[in-house]
Amino acid sequence: MNSKRHLGHTARKRFGQNFLHDDNVIQGIVAAIYPQKGQFLVEIGPGLGALTEPVADQTDRLTVVELDRDLAQRLRHHPFLHQKLNVIETDAMQFDFGKLYEDEHLAEQGQKLRVFGNLPYNISTPLIFHLLKFYDKIQDMHFMLQKEVVKRLCAAPNSKAYGRLTIMTQYFCQVMPVLEVPPTAFKPAPKVDSAVVRLIPHKELPHPVKDLYWLNRVTSQAFNQRRKTLRNALSTLFTPEQLTALNIDLTARAENLSIADYARLANWLADNPPADVRRDEIIEENEE
């Protein structure tokens, strides 16, 4: 038997497809989402409908974003859900969730998007960064992710898991782990453990920055060289005297600073941009 084939569909490696089939896990995730009629729910990567069906049972409409042409077509012809489903066949990484919010006139209805999904593990981190651009249009997010990614999302300073993903996510959202999921809950079974996480965007940002570019810049530069002291890692942005004036320990490393610390550095850079730093240069994602 082909271990990658499930319900007549063969999982495609290039899409990072692993299909959820454990009923207990599915029930646990749906209970965590707690879908209600009248809400605007969006599922990313519905696949074969393991979450789609029980969520749609509890609501009157559901928008799904699916890249796989065959799966999108399958959902359009779902035997009993097709009238509830709005199937958008596109790459979620390129999708404008803000436009969806506007097109559905959710502001006038006093609503926001509720986003959930079993995210392809090969794009989960950049997809989360993409979704954070629309944090003010989103009520909450529930995602199945690689367990190690959930640990990073939930991490605290002074830990190995703490990194740029932690800071940028917690800058925008409250992060809560929901449940852990074994590989046997999927077909084909992934080689890693999984977990479900809940992200609730802050109604008011606890540590607002004047220019998000500088928060991206300073966190990227710090964590791309996380083994170095901040005195060295941030030497192109700050002098030692400037860091000291900002209450930063020169011997500290990237994981030792809180989100509030990074926000303070970003706001200083917004007011005092280094003359030799080009805003258009690409910030490489390469945490050590």
Swiss-Prot record:
Functional summary from the UniProt entry: Specifically dimethylates two adjacent adenosines (A1518 and A1519) in the loop of a conserved hairpin near the 3'-end of 16S rRNA in the 30S particle. May play a critical role in biogenesis of 30S subunits.
Keyword Cell membrane: no
NCBIfam families listed in its UniProt record: ksgA
SUPFAM superfamilies, alphabetized: S-adenosyl-L-methionine-dependent methyltransferases (SSF53335)
Family: Belongs to the class I-like SAM-binding methyltransferase superfamily. rRNA adenine N(6)-methyltransferase family. RsmA subfamily.
EC number: 2.1.1.182
PROSITE patterns with a match to the protein in the record: RRNA_A_DIMETH, SAM_RNA_A_N6_MT
Top-level lineage group: Bacteria
Secretion signal span: none
Gene from which this protein is expressed: rsmA
Assigned GO CC terms: cytosol
Amino acids binding S-adenosyl-L-methionine: N18, L20, G45, E66, D91, N118
Catalytic activity: adenosine(1518)/adenosine(1519) in 16S rRNA + 4 S-adenosyl-L-methionine = N(6)-dimethyladenosine(1518)/N(6)-dimethyladenosine(1519) in 16S rRNA + 4 S-adenosyl-L-homocysteine + 4 H(+)
Protein name in UniProt: Ribosomal RNA small subunit methyltransferase A
The entry's keywords: Cytoplasm, Methyltransferase, RNA-binding, rRNA processing, S-adenosyl-L-methionine, Transferase
Pfam families membership: RrnaAD
Phylogenetic lineage: Bacteria, Pseudomonadati, Pseudomonadota, Gammaproteobacteria, Pasteurellales
PANTHER family associated with the record: DIMETHYLADENOSINE TRANSFERASE (PTHR11727), DIMETHYLADENOSINE TRANSFERASE-RELATED (PTHR11727:SF7)
UniProt-annotated location(s): Cytoplasm
A GO molecular-function descriptor: RNA binding
